[in-house]
A protein has these predicted regions:
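Conserved catalytic/ligand-binding micro-motifs in nucleotide and anionic cofactor chemistry
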Residues: 1-247, 251-361, 379, 385-518
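A cross-taxon signal for low-complexity, glycine/charged-rich
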Residues: 365-367, 371-378, 382
Length: 518
């Protein structure tokens, strides 16, 4: 079970000292809750791009007073007279704010109300019913534990899922009808059977129909297509094309090449995130919220989606990764990269020893844990532990990245209930399918062998935390025109030219003549 949620900071609100309290709240993005004196009452919970500005608007004294000194009623919401406690947590990105708001709403109002407030809906997926006698493919947004291994997604919308489904089914002879088949030889069939786009399993026993074994093999080919994102059929058609080319049957090879291009176009309609739902894993990098003693953030926030859990953030330090960031920008040439010759500190600060009576969540790290005010840290997805985080004992960037991923993976071992699974999947889908210019951060998927691309993750962390390299200032070619010039070798053809005059050096002391030395 997940640990109880708690904000990082909690302060008592007193109207007479509200100015000092509001000045102590950072003018940065975050999530906050306003509570009254009754602990059982529902809080005012929301997120803000500027915590201090939003709280001033809600808790500032009224600006207009009548002749008796009483505040004039205003349409603006003001909770100054109702609030007793303020709780807040600073975040580093919009993605972290959304995830934190979901956890806070789930803890305060329950899962159903949190889902309604954040407008979370299960994303659409494609399911191929391999457990049925006559499998078919259809789009749905109803997930169950039984259907996870047969579902592929998520897709941004139902229309996108159905468009991809139609493109894939055009490559195979799987049925498209939705009825529960009871085959018999005199079955009327459908229009797809008449167009030779279906194997007609409904006419079992008819010479024109297929056998159950043939239909099962065709269904397995479709399942392999979804599983490999089209690579299985691409390899099959490419092998047939090469065989036809070697046999000098160039017409057949050309037709197979067109078929290969059609398969390729169909496979590209699915985004890279479309995977088997039960095997979906994604690592998201966002800008981390700076620590209290940091003037400039030097770490990225890591989030992990695995086994239906979306956990994080885990801070990943970019110490020693500056050269990697510069190399990804303009190449590995030392002529173009003079900063790569500069020394880079490779030692991290001494690890913080955690006492047995002060538990810390590994997904938060000791830096953020030191800022927690209260008995519980900000809700990580997993039980608390008392061991020191291994990521802060690592010395190389690769070791720190692996340790951060392992720390997050510890909280994804137990499968969540399907409602929470769908909520986390919806949060991932909502962020991933944003327009590229509006989607802050980077996402990484595992390699085909299941390993994480550590080097690419470090490059992405450097880009997220340090920002893109500053562009080289362009040469000002017009500046030379403003300088005083002089023509030398005037009148000599081919030799005459105009050169700028350098400014004279200011005289610092009186000139010394030979007579002064006698």
């Amino acid at each position: 079970m997940a640990a109880p949620f708690a904000f990082e900071h909690r302060a008592e609100f007193l109207p007479e000292s509200s100015d000092d309290l509001l000045r102590s709240i950072p003018a940065a993005p975050g999530v906050f809750a306003l509570r009254g004196a009754d602990p059982a009452a529902e809080p005012y919970l929301t997120r803000a791009a500027d915590l201090r500005r939003r709280l001033r608007r809600l808790l500032a004294p009224p600006e207009a007073l009548d002749e008796n000194g009483q505040p004039v009623p205003s349409k603006r919401l003001n909770l100054r007279a109702r609030i007793h406690w303020i709780e807040w947590t600073r975040t580093g990105s919009d993605f972290e704010s959304t995830l934190l708001l979901y956890r806070a709403a789930r803890s305060a109002f329950g899962p159903d109300e949190a889902r309604r407030r954040l407008r979370l809906h299960a994303p659409y997926v494609l399911r191929i019913t391999m457990s049925q006698p006559h499998p078919r493919v259809y789009s749905t947004n109803r997930l169950s534990k039984k259907s996870l291994r047969e579902s592929f997604g998520p897709f941004p919308s139902r229309a996108t899922a159905e468009r991809y489904c139609d493109a894939v089914l055009d490559l195979f002879l799987l049925r498209r009808c939705y009825e529960d088949l009871e085959p018999y030889p005199e079955h009327p069939g459908c229009v797809y059977g008449e167009m030779n786009k279906c194997m007609q399993p409904c006419k079992e026993g008819n010479p024109q129909a297929c056998t159950p074994e043939q239909y099962a093999r065709e269904a397995q080919r479709v399942f392999d297509f979804f599983l490999t994102r089209g690579q299985s059929l691409l390899d099959e058609v490419a092998a047939q094309r090469d065989a036809a080319s070697e046999a000098m049957d160039f017409e057949a090879a050309a037709a197979l090449h067109k078929q290969w291009e059609k398969v390729r176009a169909a496979s590209l309609q699915a985004d890279e995130l479309v995977r088997p739902i039960d095997q979906l894993r994604a690592l998201i990098l966002q800008e981390a919220a700076p620590l209290e003693d940091e003037t400039r953030p030097e770490a990225a926030a890591v989030f992990l989606f695995q086994h239906g859990h979306l956990c994080g953030p885990q801070r990943l330090s970019t110490l020693g990764v500056r050269a990697v960031r510069e190399q990804t920008a303009v190449g590995s040439s030392l002529f173009a990269q003079p900063l790569m010759l500069a020394p880079i500190p490779l030692n991290e600060p001494a690890p913080i020893q955690i006492a047995q009576n002060n538990p810390v969540i590994l997904s938060e790290g000791p830096e953020r844990a030191g800022r927690v005010e209260g008995p519980q840290p900000k809700n990580p997805e997993g039980p608390p532990t008392t061991q020191t985080a291994p990521s802060f004992l690592a010395t190389t960037p690769e070791d720190r990245a692996r340790a951060a991923i392992d720390a997050l993976a510890m909280h994804t071992e137990s499968a969540p209930d399907m409602a929470e699974f769908c909520d986390h999947l919806s949060l991932l889908r909502r962020w991933y399918y944003r327009p590229e210019k509006q989607r802050a951060g980077e996402v990484f998927l595992p390699t085909p062998d299941g390993a994480w691309p550590i080097r690419r993750i470090l490059n992405g962390a450097a880009r997220v935390a340090l920002g893109p390299p500053a562009p080289i200032s362009p040469a000002d070619r017009e500046a030379a025109k403003a300088l005083k010039t002089r023509i030398i070798h005037a009148g000599r053809e081919g030799v005459e030219r105009e050169v700028p005059l350098l400014p004279k050096r200011p005289r610092t002391r009186k000139a010394v003549t030979p007579d002064d030395l006698v």
